[in-house]
C-alpha cells in the first residue's frame, strides 16, 4: 500500500494576509512603541541634567551585550540544528501512513527557513534580553582593579572575587545553557530527520548523530569541570546552615575543597570517556562515565563532607572552626568599615554617681538635650507652618545642625514645605491648575530641637509647641529668612513629597503673564515664573507629542499654556534622580534638606556594595536597617544581600532646579574607582565638597544600622568566645509602647566622643544591650563633624546598667509620672505620646535617659490633633526626674544647680517663624517651678546664673524700654503670622528687626 500524500496547508487570501500583517504590526507597535518613547524621553532628560554620557554608556553596553549573546546563543543552537539537518540520512523508512514523525518532518521541510532560523533567533533574542540585565557585572569586569588585600586561603587579590569571578560565572552559565540547548536542538533534529530511530528492537543511531551528541555531552562535562574549579573560590563567601559565620569553615577547607578537585579530575576523565565514543562507537563507555560523575558528586561531593562535619567538626566545633572564625572576624570588619582605624573602644562605667555641679559642667550635652521628636512633631509643623491646603510636610521630619549667631552648634528639626498635589481640592485639581499653576513648594522650616515655645504646665495653657524659623517667600516676593542660615531661594520644585504622586510633572517657563501660584497679600494672589536651568524644553510639536504619548495626556497638544519657552519638570524625587545618574549606587532610605550656600539642597547618601567579599558576613539590608521608624511608615531598604558596603558617594539635588551633583566621599573604595572609570567625569573629587556642604553631611542612618547589627557580634576578638555567642550584644527593641521593632539610632548634639573633649559634636548614637538581656552592653556613636567624620566610638559598659527598656519601664511606672499623666489624659481628653528615649553620656561616667512626653487633643492620630511638649522625663542610676521642662527634670533628678547650663523654653508668645529673644547681658531665663505633682514635693526654682563677677545685672531705663518694644513687635508679628497676610508679616518682621537693633544699641 502506498503512503498517503501529506495534506497541504490551506492558503490565506490576500485580504487575510494584510489584516494579519496589520494586526501584528499593531501588536509590535504597542509592545515596542512605549520603549522607544521612554528611551527618547530619557535621552532628553539625561541631557538636561548633564549626564547623557551615563545614559549612552549604559544603553550601548546593554545593546552590545544583547547582540553578542543573542548571536552567540542563536549561532550555537543553529549549529546544532544545521548539523542534524545536513547529516540526515538520504532515505528514512516510515512506520506506515500514520507515522507522526513523517508528518512533523514534512511540516518542517515545508517551512525549513522558519524553523531553521526562527527557533535559534527566538532563543538567542530571549537569551540576549536576559543577559543585557547583567551589564553591571560586565562593566566591573572590564574596569575593576585591585583591592590591595589578599584572601587568606588562595592568596588572590580581593579584586578577583569582586570583579572577575562573577563575570567568569556568568560566562560559564551562558555557555552551559547554550551547549545544553544545542544538545536538545541536535537531538530533536536527528530524531526528526531520521538520524535517531526508535522503531524496531534496538532502534538506530547514525554515525553523525552519535559523534555530534557525544561531542556536546563531552563539552557539557568539561564545562562542569570548570564549574568545579570556580566553586573552590566561591566557598570563601558562601553560607551554610549551622555555621555561625560566612565563608569556608573547617569542613569546607578540609573536605569540600578537596572534593571539588577530585570531582574536577573525575569530570575530565569522564569527558575523555565520552569523547572516546567518537572512535570506539560504543555508547556504554560514555554512559558509564556520566553515571560515575553523578555517583561521585553524591559520594564525594556530599557524603564525605557530611561525614567530616558530623564526626570530626561537631564534637569539637569551637576549636575546629576557630581559625576560620578569625578569618571571618577580620574580613567582616574590613568589609563593613569596622576596623581599628575607624572604631575606638573605651571602657565606661555607665552608672557613676553624678552631682548637680558635674552635670551642669557637662555643658555641651546638657545645653543640647533634645526635646523635639522629629517623628512626632510633623502635625505641629503642619498646623503652624502649612499656610495652604496644598503644602505639606512628611510624616517623619529630619535632623540637622547649624551654628547660631554666637557660633554654638545646635541641632534642628528641619523640613521643606513641599507641594503635595494629592491635597489639591475642587477646581485646583484640573489639569491646568495641577500641572501649570500649583507647581512648587515654598519654604524651609527649622525648629531648635532643644527648646519649645513656652511651658505647658497644664494642657490648656499655650505652650510646648516648636519654635519655628521659617524661611519663605514673603510680602511682595521678598524672601523672609530668619535662620538658621540665610536663604535666597525658598521655592521647592523637587522633593520626595512632590514626587510621591502619580504624574508628578510640572510645566513651567515664560509664556505670557506669570501663571504659577507663589504667595498672597491682602490685595491679590501673586504668581511666579520659573527661571531655573532645570527642565526639558517642550516648545516644539515633536516633544509635545512625545510627552503627550508618555503621559497619555492630550492637553500637551491642545493647551495654549504651553509655549515655545515652556519646559517640563519630571522625575522629581531626589533619591530617584541620584539612582538614575548613578545606577550602580544603592541610596539611603532617607534624604534630608539643608541650606547650603543660600540654597535648599537635598542630601542623598549613596552606597557601593558587593555580595561576595570573602569571609565577610552576608547581611540583608532590609533586615539590618529595619527599626520602629521605618516600620511605622513602611519605608524599608531594598531586600538586597551585601557583604561589603561603603558610603562612597555624597549626592546633592538642588530643590529649585533639580541639579544633581555627585561627590566621592570614600576615594579609596576600589568599587567606586571602577565606576569612575566606567563613567568618567561624572563624580567630583572629595576636595570639591564645599565647607558649607561639609557642615551638613551626616553619618548615614542605613550604614550605621548595618554596622551596629554587625558590631553586636564582630566586636568579639576571641574566636572561641565568638562561637559560644556569650559576649554578643543585641540591638535593643524600641521601648515605646506604640513601637514594634528595633530602637532607631538618634542624631544628637552632645559631648564629642570622637575627640573625647568637652566640645559639642553632631553624632549618630545607639545603645546596645547584652545578648538577650535588657542590660546595657555598650553605647555607640558615629561622628558627623568634618574633622572626625566617620569615626565610631564604642563605650563598653560592664556590670548591670539598665538598658532602654528597663529605663522606660522605671519612668512610666513611677508614681508621680503615672499619676500626673493620668490626670492629663483622663477621660480621653488628651492623647499621651512618648517621644524618643535618648541615651546621653553625662558627668564623670553615667548615662542619662531622656524622654519627652507629648499631649494632643483627643485620641486620634489625625494631623489636626497636633502634639506639644507637656513634660520631660529622665532616668539616671535608678532615679527618675520629671517636670515640664528639661531644667525642671534635671533639678528634680540631680538637685538645684544641675540645670545651670540647660536650655530653657522660648517665650510663650513667640511668633511663628522667629527665634527666641536672648535674655540681656547673658542672663538665662529661670525655669518655672513645676506644680505640686502627685507623689513629689514642688521643686524650688534654680538660682539665676550670674553674667559676671558682680552677679545678675539690672536693666537700665533705656534698655527696659527697648525690651518692651521688642515684646510688642513680637506680639504684632504673631498676629500677622496668624492672619496669613504676607505683606503685614513682612512689615511686622521689619519692626521687630528695628526693635532688636534699638535694644542692642541701648545702654
From Swiss-Prot:
Q: Where is this chain primarily localised?
A: membrane
Keyword vocabulary terms for this entry: Cell membrane, Membrane, Transmembrane, Transmembrane helix
From the Swiss-Prot or TrEMBL record, state where the protein is found.
Answer: Cell membrane
* Transmembrane segment boundaries: 18-38, 63-83, 114-134, 176-196, 211-231, 260-280, 288-308
Q: Which domain of life is it from?
A: Bacteria
Kindly give the Pfam families that the UniProt entry links to this protein: UPF0182
Question: Annotated region Disordered: where?
Answer: 902-979
Has the keyword Thylakoid been applied to this entry? no
Task: Give a Gene Ontology cellular component term annotated to this protein.
Answer: plasma membrane
Composition-biased stretches, type Low complexity, lie in 902-937
Q: Which topology term describes how it sits in the membrane?
A: Multi-pass membrane protein
Q: Where is the signal peptide?
A: none
Assigned protein family: Belongs to the UPF0182 family.
PANTHER family in UniProt: UPF0182 PROTEIN SLL1060 (PTHR39344:SF1)
Q: What is this protein called?
A: UPF0182 protein Mkms_1433
Q: Which organism is it from?
A: Mycobacterium sp. (strain KMS)
Amino acid at each position: 500500500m502506498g503512503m498517503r500524500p501529506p495534506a497541504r496547508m490551506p492558503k490565506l487570501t490576500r485580504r487575510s494576509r494584510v489584516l494579519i500583517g496589520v494586526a501584528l504590526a499593531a501588536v509590535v507597535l504597542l509592545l515596542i512603541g512605549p520603549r522607544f518613547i521612554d528611551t527618547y524621553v530619557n535621552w532628553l532628560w539625561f541631557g538636561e541634567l548633564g549626564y547623557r554620557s551615563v545614559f549612552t554608556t549604559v544603553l550601548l553596553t546593554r545593546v552590545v551585550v544583547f547582540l553578542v549573546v543573542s548571536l552567540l546563543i542563536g549561532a550555537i543552537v543553529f549549529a546544532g540544528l544545521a548539523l542534524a539537518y545536513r547529516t540526515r540520512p538520504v532515505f528514512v523508512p516510515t512506520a506506515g501512513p500514520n507515522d507522526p514523525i513523517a508528518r512533523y518532518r514534512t511540516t518542517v521541510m515545508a517551512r525549513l527557513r522558519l524553523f531553521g532560523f526562527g527557533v535559534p533567533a527566538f532563543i538567542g533574542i530571549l537569551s540576549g534580553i536576559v543577559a543585557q540585565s547583567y551589564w553591571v557585572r560586565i562593566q566591573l569586569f572590564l574596569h575593576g582593579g585591585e583591592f590591595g588585600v589578599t584572601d587568606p586561603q588562595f592568596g588572590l587579590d580581593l579584586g578577583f572575587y569582586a570583579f572577575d569571578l562573577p563575570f567568569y560565572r556568568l560566562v560559564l552559565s551562558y555557555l552551559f545553557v547554550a551547549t545544553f540547548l544545542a544538545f536538545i536542538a541536535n537531538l530533536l533534529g536527528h530524531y526528526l530527520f531520521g538520524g535517531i530511530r526508535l522503531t524496531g528492537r534496538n532502534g538506530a543511531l547514525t554515525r553523525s548523530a552519535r559523534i555530534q551528541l557525544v561531542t556536546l555531552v563531552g563539552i557539557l562535562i568539561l564545562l562542569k569541570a570548570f564549574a568545579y574549579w570556580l566553586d573552590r573560590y566561591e566557598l570563601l563567601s558562601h553560607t551554610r546552615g549551622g555555621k555561625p559565620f560566612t565563608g569556608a569553615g573547617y569542613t569546607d577547607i578540609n573536605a569540600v575543597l578537596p572534593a571539588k578537585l577530585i570531582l574536577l579530575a573525575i569530570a575530565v576523565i569522564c569527558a575523555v570517556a565520552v569523547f572516546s565514543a567518537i572512535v570506539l562507537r560504543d555508547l556504554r563507555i560514555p554512559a558509564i562515565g556520566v553515571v560515575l560523575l553523578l555517583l561521585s558528586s553524591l559520594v564525594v561531593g556530599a557524603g564525605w563532607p557530611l561525614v567530616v562535619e558530623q564526626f570530626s567538626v561537631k564534637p569539637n566545633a569551637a576549636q575546629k572552626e576557630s581559625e576560620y572564625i578569625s578569618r571571618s572576624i577580620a574580613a567582616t570588619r574590613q568589609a563593613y568599615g569596622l576596623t581599628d582605624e575607624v572604631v575606638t573602644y573605651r571602657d565606661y562605667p555607665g552608672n557613676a554617681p553624678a552631682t548637680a555641679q558635674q552635670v551642669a559642667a557637662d555643658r555641651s550635652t546638657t545645653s543640647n538635650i533634645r526635646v523635639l521628636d522629629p517623628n512626632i512633631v510633623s502635625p505641629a509643623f503642619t498646623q503652624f507652618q502649612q499656610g495652604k491646603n496644598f503644602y505639606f510636610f512628611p510624616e517623619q521630619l529630619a535632623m540637622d545642625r547649624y551654628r547660631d549667631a554666637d557660633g554654638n552648634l545646635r541641632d534642628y528639626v528641619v523640613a521643606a514645605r513641599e507641594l503635595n498635589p494629592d491635597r489639591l481640592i475642587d477646581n485646583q485639581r484640573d489639569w491646568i491648575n495641577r500641572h501649570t499653576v500649583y507647581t512648587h513648594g515654598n519654604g524651609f522650616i527649622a525648629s531648635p530641637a532643644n527648646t519649645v515655645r513656652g511651658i505647658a504646665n497644664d494642657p490648656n495653657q499655650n505652650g510646648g509647641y516648636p519654635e519655628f524659623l521659617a524661611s519663605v517667600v514673603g510680602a511682595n516676593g521678598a524672601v523672609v529668612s530668619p535662620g538658621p542660615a540665610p536663604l535666597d531661594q525658598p521655592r521647592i520644585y523637587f522633593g520626595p513629597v512632590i514626587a510621591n504622586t502619580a504624574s508628578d510633572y510640572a510645566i513651567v517657563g515664560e509664556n505670557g503673564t506669570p501663571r504659577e501660584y507663589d504667595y498672597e497679600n491682602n490685595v491679590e494672589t501673586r504668581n511666579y515664573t520659573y527661571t531655573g536651568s532645570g527642565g526639558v524644553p517642550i516648545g516644539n510639536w515633536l516633544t509635545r507629542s512625545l510627552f503627550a504619548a508618555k503621559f497619555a495626556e492630550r492637553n500637551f497638544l491642545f493647551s495654549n499654556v504651553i509655549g515655545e519657552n515652556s519646559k517640563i519638570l519630571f522625575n522629581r524625587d531626589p533619591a530617584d534622580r541620584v539612582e538614575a545618574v548613578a545606577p550602580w549606587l544603592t541610596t539611603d532610605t532617607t534624604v534630608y534638606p539643608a541650606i547650603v550656600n543660600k540654597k535648599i539642597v537635598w542630601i542623598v547618601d549613596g552606597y557601593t556594595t558587593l555580595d561576595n567579599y570573602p569571609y565577610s558576613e552576608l547581611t540583608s539590608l532590609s533586615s539590618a536597617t529595619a527599626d520602629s521608624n521605618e516600620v511605622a511608615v513602611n519605608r524599608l531598604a531594598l531586600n538586597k544581600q551585601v557583604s561589603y558596603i561603603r558610603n562612597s558617594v555624597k549626592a546633592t539635588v538642588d530643590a529649585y532646579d533639580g541639579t544633581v551633583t555627585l561627590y566621592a566621599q570614600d576615594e579609596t573604595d576600589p568599587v567606586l574607582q571602577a565606576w569612575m572609570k566606567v563613567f568618567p567625569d561624572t563624580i567630583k573629587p572629595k576636595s570639591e565638597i564645599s565647607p558649607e556642604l561639609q557642615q551638613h553631611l551626616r553619618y548615614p542612618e542605613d550604614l550605621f544600622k548595618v554596622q551596629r547589627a554587625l558590631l553586636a557580634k564582630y566586636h568579639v576578638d576571641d574566636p572561641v568566645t565568638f562561637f559560644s555567642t556569650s559576649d554578643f550584644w543585641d540591638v535593643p527593641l524600641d521601648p515605646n509602647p506604640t513601637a514594634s521593632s528595633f530602637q532607631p539610632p538618634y542624631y544628637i548634639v552632645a559631648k564629642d566622643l570622637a575627640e573625647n573633649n568637652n566640645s559639642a559634636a553632631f553624632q549618630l548614637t545607639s545603645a546596645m544591650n547584652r545578648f538577650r538581656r535588657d542590660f546595657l552592653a555598650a553605647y555607640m556613636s558615629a561622628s558627623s563633624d568634618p574633622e572626625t567624620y566617620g569615626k565610631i566610638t564604642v563605650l563598653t559598659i560592664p556590670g548591670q546598667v539598665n538598658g532602654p527598656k528597663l529605663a522606660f519601664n522605671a519612668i512610666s511606672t513611677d508614681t508621680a509620672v503615672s499619676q500626673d499623666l493620668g490626670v492629663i489624659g483622663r477621660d480621653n481628653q488628651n492623647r499621651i505620646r512618648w517621644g524618643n528615649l535618648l541615651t546621653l553620656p553625662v558627668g564623670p561616667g553615667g548615662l542619662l535617659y531622656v524622654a519627652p512626653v507629648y499631649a494632643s487633643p483627643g485620641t486620634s492620630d489625625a494631623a489636626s490633633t497636633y502634639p506639644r511638649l507637656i513634660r520631660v522625663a529622665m532616668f539616671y542610676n535608678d532615679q527618675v526626674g520629671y517636670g515640664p521642662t528639661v531644667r525642671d527634670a534635671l533639678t528634680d533628678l540631680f538637685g538645684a544647680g544641675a540645670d545651670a547650663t540647660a536650655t530653657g523654653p522660648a517665650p510663650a508668645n513667640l511668633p511663628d517663624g522667629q527665634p527666641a529673644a536672648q535674655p540681656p547681658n547673658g542672663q538665662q531665663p529661670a525655669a518655672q517651678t513645676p506644680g505640686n505633682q502627685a507623689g513629689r514635693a514642688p521643686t524650688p526654682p534654680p538660682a539665676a546664673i550670674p553674667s559676671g563677677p558682680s552677679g545678675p545685672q539690672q536693666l537700665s531705663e533705656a534698655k527696659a524700654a527697648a525690651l518692651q518694644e521688642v515684646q510688642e513687635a513680637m506680639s504684632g508679628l504673631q498676629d500677622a503670622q496668624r492672619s496669613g497676610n504676607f505683606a503685614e508679616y513682612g512689615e511686622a518682621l521689619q519692626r521687630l528687626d528695628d526693635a532688636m537693633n534699638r535694644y542692642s544699641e541701648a545702654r
